[in-house]
Every structure is written in C-alpha cells, then in structure tokens.
Amino acid sequence: MTTSVSPKSRSLFTAFFWLFNLSLLLVIFIGFLPFLAMDILNDALRGEVPFSILIPVFGLIGVPTTSTALGIQRKRQLNKISNLKPAAPLGPMPQPISLFQIFFGLEAPLLMACTIRLFFLRALTPASSFLFISLAVGTIALAHWLLHRHHRQSSWASWMHLAGLTIMLVLSLYLSVIALFYVLPLIVVMGSALYLSIFLVVLIPIFFPFIMVFSGLVMMPWGMLRLFLRSWRQTLQSLSQQHGKTLPRAWVGTVLAVWLGLLLLLQQQPQTQAFTLLEKQPQSEGERQALLQNADAIRKGLLNAYLSAYRYPLLEDKGMYRMYSNLLGAPNAVAETVQDAYRTVLTPFAYQGNALDKDKAAQLYAEFFDTPILRGEHSTIQNAVLSNFNRTEAKAGLLDIGAERVRLQQQDVSITPEGDWAEIKLHEVYANTTFENTEILYYFSLPESATITGLWLGETADLAQRYEYVVAPRGAAQQVYTDQVRRQVDPALLEQVGPRNYRLRAFPIPPAGRDLLPQDGQPDRMHLWMTYKVMKQNDQWMLPVLNEQRNIFWTQDTQRTLNGKPQQKSDAWLPASIPADVSEPASALQAKLPGGYVVAKPLAEQDYQLPQGQHFAFIVDRSYSMEAHRKELEDSFQWLKDNLLGANSADLYLTRADGTQAQKVSSLDAFDPGKTVLYGSLQTRQMLDQYQQVAEAQNYDAVILLTDSGSYELTQDGSPLPLAAPLWLVHLGGLQAAYDDATLATIQQTGGNVAADIKTVMTRIATQPSLGQGTSLLNVVDGYAWFLSSTPDSDVKTVEAVAPMAARQWIAQVSQAVKPDQLNQLDAIHQVAKENSIVTPYSSMLVLVNPEQKRQLKEAEASDRFNREVEDQQLPDPQDEIAPVSAVPEPAEWLLLLACFAVLAVWWRWKATRNEINHNLPPLNEV
C-alpha cells in the first residue's frame, strides 16, 4: 500500500499511538485488571462465567499489550533497516507494517469488539454473533494481506483477501455512521473542557489516560474506514489487472449480497412468530397438535422476549435523545429524530417489541409449557444473567435455584436406634461465599410416619449457646420469619408443606470473611441442628430426600460424618437411607396421649390387599408437562387393567387446558394414554373443578388424580374443595416439592394422601386392618398400621418416647373433621403439637434469637395465625434484582467518588468565575 504521509503527520500519529496504548495499559493494569478482571477470572474458575465473556476479558488485556509489543518490534526493524548498506542499489526495501496499520487494522477492530461485547452486550443474539464473526474474519484477512502483500500470492488468497476486506469495509462504514451521532456532543464536551482547562491543571494527570483512551475509541471507526478502504481498493485493482474489472466487481457484489442476506436472515426475531401462534386459544385437538409441533419455535420466541433486556441492551433506550436535548439544547423534535435515526442504525442490536413483552412471555410460557419460565429455561437464563462484566450485579441476579452462594462446610448425621424406631439428628455448618447476608432453603421429604422434633440455630458448635425453637401456628410463624428476614435478623423456619413435604429456611448466613465472634479467630459460620423420629422401614433408617435447594451447595471438600465416623465424599445431600440392625424382629408399640392410646402394629407382606368391588374415579392430568411422564402414565393404566378393573369399576375423567369441563370416559379400556394430546397448563385446583362439573352425582370410594410433580409457584391461594370421596394424588416421576394450604387441606379433610405410583395408592386404600372393638384405624403407612384405642393393650409395650409420632398420626386423622375457619379446633390441634414439640400441617418450628422476635410472634398469634400464603408464586426474577450497596466503598468506588468531587469542584469554580464576570459587566443601560 502506498501512502503519501508527511513526516509531521507520521510523527504526530506515532506520538498518539504510544500515548494511547500506554494510557490504555495504565487503565487496564491499574483499574480493570485488579478489580473487574480478577472478579471475572475468579468466578470463571468456579464455572460461573460464560466463555463468551472470558474472550473479551483476555482480549482487553492482550490486544493493547500485543499492539505495544508490535510497535516496539517495528521500531527495532526500522533501526536494522537503517543500518543496512547494500553493495548495489536494489530499489526500495520492504518496510515493516506501519503503526497506522497496526492500530487501525489490528488493534482497533479487536479492541472495539472486546469493548462492545464486554460492556454493552450480555447474551449474544444470532445477529450480533454474526457481526462479531464477520469482524474477526475481516481482521484476519487484513492481517494476512499485510504479512504477505510484498510476496507473490495465490489467486485463491487474493480472492479471500478481497472478500474479507469487503466485509470489513462495510463494518467500518457502519461503525463510522454510529460514531457520527457522537460528533456534536463530543465537540461540545471538548469545547467545555478547553474553556475550563485553566481549572483542570491539577486534574490533568488523573484524567489524561481516560481522555486519551476515549479519544482513541472515538477515532477508531474513521481510521478503520480509511485503512480498509485503501486496502480494499489496492486488492481490487490488483485482481482487476489480472482478471479484468468485471469478475472482481462481481465477486464483491456476491460477497455483499450473501453477507447482507445472512445478516437479514439472522435479524429475524422469533418472538413475533411465538406471539402470533399463541394469540388465539386452540379450539380443537388438531389445533393443539399443530401448536405442539411448533413447540420449539414457541419456546425460542418466548425465551427471546423474556431475555430481551439481556440480549438487546438498547431496548427503548433514550440516551441519544437525552444527550441532544440536555447537553446540546436541541428541540424535542430534533432530539426525537436523532434518537429514531440512531435506533434505526442499531437495528441488529434492537429488540422488535416493547418492555411489556417480558411479562407477556412469562405468562404465555407458563400457560403453554405448564411450568414457570425460570424453571423450564433455567440454564439459558442463568447463562444470560452471568454474562455480565459487573460480577456483583451478576451474582445478585442469579436464580436462587441451583445458585452456589453458601457452601455446606460440614454435615454430621447421628442415629440413635431404639428397636423399631430411632431418633436421627442432622447437624450442618454453612459458610457463605459472598459478601452479603444470604438465605438458604431446602425442600425435602420424609417418610409419612417420620416426625420432626427439634430445630436449633447457633453461631458456634457449642450446644449450650444455640438458639432453641418454638412451635408456632403456621401463618404466624411465616409472617414473623418474613418480617425478620427483611430486617436482616437471624431466624429459621421449618414448615410442613405437604403430607410428607417440608420446607426449611435459615437466614442470614454470615458474609464471607466476617469475624465478630470473640477469641475464635475463624470466619463466622452458621450451625443448624434438626432432629426427627422415624420408624424402621425395610430394615433401613430413612433420611430426608432432597426435592430442591436454593443458594446452598456442597463439594468434595464437605466434611461428612455418620455417628462420628468420616464418610465418603458424595454429590448427594444425604444418602437415601442407612442400614438398620435386623437382629430383632419388628414389634408393636404404643404411646399414651390425652384421651387414649395410639398403637403402631407392623404389617407383613401378606397383610396388604387390593380393592375388591369398589368404584373409583381416575382423573388424568393432560397438561404439557405430562409429556415427560407419558411412559409412566402408560404403565399405570396397564397396571390398572391387569390388577384392578376385573374386580372393580372405574370412570375416567380427561382434563382440558381450555378451562372447560373434563371429558368423561366410562371405560378405561377405551383410553390410550400413548395417543392422548398433552397440552397447556393445568393446576390441581383447576383439574378438580373440571371433574366436579361432570361428576356431581357420582359416588366414588376414592378420587385418584394422576399428575406429575407440578409447579407450586403457579398455584393460587384458595379454599379447600368439598369432595365426597378421599382424594389421592399420584405424582408420576416424583412427589411435588410443596402444596398450597387449600390443596393440602382438601387431601387431609377427605382422608386422602399422595404417592409416586398407583400400586401404593390402591394397597393403602384396600388395606384396613383392625384390632377389635374399642379401636379405630388411623393410618396405614411405611409398613405399620396405626390405631387409636381407648384403653392400653397389655400385650404391647408402652414407649413414651414415640408419643411425638403417635401425636402426628392422631393429628392426621382428626384433620379430616377440622374446618379451616374453626379456630378453636385448630388451636386444640396446635396445642397437641406444642406439647409434643412436633411439626404438623398446622404448626411450624421457628427459631427466635431476641425478645423483639418473641413479642412479634405473640402479636401474630393473636390474629390470622393459621393462614399461610403461597410462597414464590413467581420465582426470583433476575431482572428485578438490585446490586447490593456496600457500607464501605470499594477501591473502584473511591475513584468514582474522587471523580465526582473533582467535577463538583470544577463546576463550582466555573460558576464562581462566571458570576465574577457578570458582576464586572456594565449594566445594560450603560452599554
């Protein structure tokens, strides 16, 4: 490339090149690397940073460093060339790549790409990814051309050079057009700086590197345009001399057509199609089937709309309008025109919709896919949240589900066997990995006969200093816990949220590095203890089964012990069970309660029966989420046909997502679960309402709903349903994590329950053992039959220690007759729970640490004490999270504060000077 550059211009650019790169390296290695970059790299080691974020981080460090190294190498090459004295004149010697070419051809495009990707874009779209790939291809083409331009090149290489330079020329022109919008504001800012320069002398050393970096970034698009235009023209002329003008020009046109076609194709955003497809409710099975065939397109479109704030950062942005209106004083019409033009130019980065589409997408997703979008698209949303250079903001937006904020440092399980039953104690130690107070949450399940008997919190392992629980009404306990979390005070709450489901929450886990405890010299930790009693089941002691955890995680470094003995590392929270001593056969037990005795009798395999001569109603959940469990549904119906229908009768009710009444099928043989259409969203209450609309006059021995694990967050508060038959929920694929209180009350009041398979339900319904007159059956569960007797059984050993389990079975039975508006009945049940220190559907355990919390609990117990709200109807929304504010500024914040004070000082001095000038001006009547 031949250029006619004056020595003065070359010297000025050389000075600019070195000043810019030295300033940029100063900013990067003093400001960017110690603060932002190190946070990103540390998170990357934990797997919390997408690879697309790591590339620009390394690029911002490596590009100016490499460019500076190339500049130094070029200087050395020039010195060597100047020292060469050829014996004969051989013509001009090939010159090394110029600083202009290094800066605008290599450094500028890569630096701009890294800056835009890291600071302005989060989750990449197909269009933005295509532009970055195009920029990389064009830069590689120029680099190859610069390295080989003095050598004979193959025809194929020349054509590729022309293609790459053509693409890069278009991109340079595109960036130059964007930069034009900043020309007038830049002139105004520079003019103001010149006007105030006399007052900025002291601040010049501080702001000079930033001024140089900013000036260089603004100059880059035009310098790139000039360089790539000259390189493109030279390559085009070279090929035209070899092949004529027509072929190279046709090649340029083809490259442009293909490139623009691909860009336009990738700019098509999928949310428009998704919204159109879901605009009207389908009225027939054929229409539903057609929508299901487009499920992938609908998923992509709704996800794109939901993540619009992450994928399209310029969504409804008014920055250019404010810049021209406020800074330049332009009329509103002019500022609006500039804003519209700016948005048009940035179409590849703009969202084709409005900010309300996010909520619309979340609602439509839940209605179509039968699960909250934050669950269904967890990994994609998590990746978008983590694609942020600001790690504090990224971590604040992390979904609590699966988030790794609090490490389980230690876990101790202690089992104290007492023959057929045992007391199990779980002790855990939590270490926060963040610098904010953090809540942990477990959803877990226990055997239905297991009974939780204690909960404690502590700041150390000293049992004498731990905070003890109180048994409180479920609504009052929830209210106090929620209020105390808002006040950043330590509480813990353990609730029963299903027949065998529990929710455990503890707050706050102390921030990492905090050490407020005297004389221990260790970072603060939180200790938690939980105890429960459980009957032996299949010669095993059953441990809690984790359904979901939030914020808590464990690693191979987590210390685990069982009865004081170290255990092997595990990826699971707890083992499913621990082998029990089988030397003694199971025997009956009894415990005394006020008003009678509760007897637990072990059952043998032959004691279990199947129904005979009964009439059942089977309700089938036909929502979209059941598609993942279609095989289990087919197996369940096959079992019913093989084992139940010959001796019993049944009606089938098929639910519908359109909200109409269920479809009744009189014969189960006529239903093929492999062909039924599974569509839309259905909750338990909706399906039962549809059933009741059709089956008002039917008398059934039991109502069985075949569903999946459900979505607790999509349920609504309500009242129990007045069903005439016991309600049993069969959760194919696993139990639901939690139930709303209305559904739980419906199950309890009808004498139903939940299970994970149809066989368990049928055997529990049919197995009705008896101990004779004066006794009544309470429950058949976990290998035991529980009875209530008015007198003690002389042949059965009385064990007062099993009274908590006996009280739990008694409460489960009397719950069938309890009305939710009868506080005296609920208070009586709660009193039994308090006397036996147990968790029940009506009574929760709350750990309180100060008198104020106890006073608040007493106030809460005086009013709406048993009404509990549905938790997390919407999961934590990362777009609503706000980065926490630290009480002590970080180093980067000190720099920002210094800059703010400097600006205020300059403004004050400028205002004083202007007032002085105005004061010295003569009055108007004297002019």
Where are these regions (language model features)?
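Acidic, polar low-complexity linker/tail segments
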Residues: 562-617, 624-635, 642-643
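A surface-exposed beta-strand-loop module
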Residues: 454-456, 461-543
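Solvent-exposed beta-hairpin/edge-strand motifs
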Residues: 373-399, 441-485, 554-573
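Short, solvent-exposed beta-strand/turn "edge" segments of beta-rich domains on protein surfaces
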Residues: 410-425, 429-434, 446, 517-521
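Pro/Ser/Thr/Gly-rich intrinsically disordered low-complexity regions
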Residues: 2-405, 451, 463-464, 702-705, ...
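Von Willebrand factor
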Residues: 609-706, 710-713, 736
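Surface-exposed beta-strand/loop patches in extracellular or lumenal glycoproteins
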Residues: 431, 436-449, 542-556
